Amino acid sequence: MTVTFDPQSGHEQKGRRPALVISNDQFNQRTGLAIVCPITNTKRNVPFHVALPPESTVTGFVMVEQVKAIDFRARQARFIEKAPEAVLNEALSLLDACIY
């Protein structure tokens, strides 16, 4: 999806950019929120970034360390494409490593 991350603070990503939704549909529908990780095109060799595959419409790297809950309606989120399951699983695994 693309989403507007403004307002932001400090090192948080800002502006309108693609993001990977890591929350499930049930959570999204019941809360009106989505848990997302922004995507950047800047390669930083950060261990918490997941590269998107070349065949993906969206290019870049999922920034797992920038996980955020957003009101997807208020932030005017728009669907782009479904992420490959391998990308989602790697992002969830890295998030788990960050939290536990």
Explain the meaning of each model-derived region.
Residues 1-100:
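Conserved functional hotspots at enzyme active or ligand-binding sites that engage polyanionic ligands
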